[in-house]
Amino acid sequence: MKAKALLLFISFACAQTVYSFGQVDCNTSTKLVCQFPFSAQTLGVFASGSNSTGALATAAEGVATPINASIATQLTQLPIPSATVGVVTLQKKGSEFGTAFDNLGPVLTDRPDTVGKGHIFAGFSYQHFNFNALAGQSLANIPIGFSYTIGNVTSFEAVSNKVDFQLDQYVGVATYGATRSTDISVVVPINSVSLSVTTSNFQGYQYNAGTNSYGQIFSPQTSVSSVGSASGVGDVTVILKHMVLGQEGSRGAIAVGASARFPSGDSLNYLGSGAFGGNVYGLFEYRARLAPHLKLSYQWNGNSQVMDLQSSSKTTLPGGLQYAGGADLKLNRSLTLATDILGNQFVNVPSFTLGKTNLPGPSGKDGIPSSIASTTPTNETYTTANSAGA
């Protein structure tokens, strides 16, 4: 899984002792968004040499905003299991279901087939997501930095982060056949987030433009570790699907549908997105021993506090096109091999770039480096592609 969004915990997301984000009071909150990557000890290292803790908080929050926004966006597009996979219909001659199709189908891509009027399908699955890279760089070593100016003094600060972020998802699915060709499904995820962050190599340099000199230097040997977890119900999704072609057992099948996502997950613990969401989609399938399938959809999202924790108002969570396609091969009546490619487009997502900031004045000597790590907020549109097989 490409972790384009998952640097929320390795940047300067919050200071739990002296700072707060908009309507989120991190002085008292125990939410993950307030605890990582800066514990009280971590921010204490920076604050001890800062000439303005308020300016320090503002600079750190400015870096956190696009990171948290990227996380929330990613959480809206995690794949969920098919709502009809595993249904095997034993057909009697003259029944309303037409030609029996006992290919068990794909795992993460839905297909046009419906369960039939009055029938119920229930399923359960487990998924594990291990986020290990961001913008092409391993989360095992991410340098982050920022700067701020008070009067004649500019502070340049940076750290290195080693991050381990994992999400375990237990998904329950229930589908009811409202009519012969229409299904209603409910998807309920139970999420468990596990996170550990080690922050080290603290660097802090204060440049005084009036005297053209540098002041406080933080020890690069300082290291602070933080561990946290959260679990609970994620965002519940309700899905409506209608088959428009294929009810009579034809080889080709087409269905259309829509889904609504509800912000039931705790977004401040990254168990959910914090926003309502809507999705419209089309499904295509050719029924054969080797059955290709395709899903095309578009995701809309509402407003989420996680998009900007500094603001009292919520900001729209980005959406975009989605696609999923693959094929499933029937080996026998009870065994099917399936493979899928899943893609997501993220439109105008608040993001960031990692780079270097050149230090002014008499840098490059007397222990002062010529440059330091920096993190620059930006907006971008990008796509991700992942594969799955079973």
Identify the residue ranges that each predicted region occupies.
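Residues that define the transmembrane beta-barrel architecture of outer-membrane proteins
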Residues: 104, 116-118, 165-170, 231-236, ...
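Outer membrane beta-barrel transmembrane domains
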Residues: 142-146, 206-222, 314-390
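Residues on the lipid-exposed face of transmembrane beta-strands in outer-membrane beta-barrel proteins
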Residues: 110-111, 122-124, 172-176, 186, ...
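Outer-membrane beta-barrel channels and translocator barrels
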Residues: 115-117, 129, 179-181, 191, ...
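Outer-membrane beta-barrel translocator domains and adjoining extracellular loop/strand segments
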Residues: 134-139, 196-203, 266-274, 299, ...
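Outer-membrane beta-barrel biogenesis signature
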Residues: 19-146, 354-358
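Extracellular loop and loop/strand-boundary signature of outer-membrane beta-barrel proteins
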Residues: 108-109, 156-160, 222-227, 265-270, ...
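Transmembrane beta-strands of outer-membrane beta-barrel pores
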Residues: 126-132, 188-194, 235, 244, ...
